[in-house]
Amino acid sequence: MLNRLTIRLGLLILATLAPVISGAQAIFVSIPPQAFLVERLTGDLVEIEVLLPPGASPATYEPTPKQMAALERSQLYLQIGAPFEGPVLAKVADLMPDVRIVDCRAGVGLQPIGTDGHDHGAGLLDPHIWLDPGRMKTIANTTAKALQALLPDQSPAIEERLATLHAAIDDTDARVGEALAPLAGQTLLVFHPAYGYFTRRYGLVQRAVEVEGKAPSARRLATVVDELDDQTLRTLFVQPQFSRTSAQRVADALDCDLVELDPLAGDFLY
């Protein structure tokens, strides 16, 4: 019994100290696509922590005290404009002077949230910039510079990996553009307006049921169904982070399929 306890205690201590023993720098990001970027740029040179857990909604999630304690021990936080970042940034600024914050939206060019090609978000900016390959290359550049500052000895390797990543993003962009070209001008019906940048890039029109991260009211649902009833829409896309109940009601009313599509998936390359 004592031997088992000793072994378990030893393993626990080893797991706790592993990042320190390995010498790896701790990097925090907000969402999985950022983690994918950092991994492609650094390999296993850093420990990557993602604030948003699988299945959680960026509109409502609150980081746990355990996550905030881990963030305090990190060297770098890469923000991207997720809704939950505000309180996190305030705490980092007030209580974590050793944590460097880098805004990965720099130079990206934000656009208003649109549900049907127009701004229905009361002036709110669309945070889903990672769904546009061109903008993702800009995000990758900012991320690479932050990592090079943190790991100066690895700067040439990071630069080389950045070039490889750019080529992979360009390849994905070209193939997606070719696949969607015959659908130019058609409507992409989504529950949450996450695909504004994506649809603009590839000549589609996003039409969303939900606005401003709020569950649609019965009146809103009825309006959407009435406006779209004369259109031939075969699919309504819903995020796994949102309840399917309201989305299913719309899909049933329009007699279209309900399909899950995750804009927060880590690997964005096709």
What feature does the model see in each segment?
Residues 24-270:
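Extracytoplasmic metal-acquisition and chelation regions
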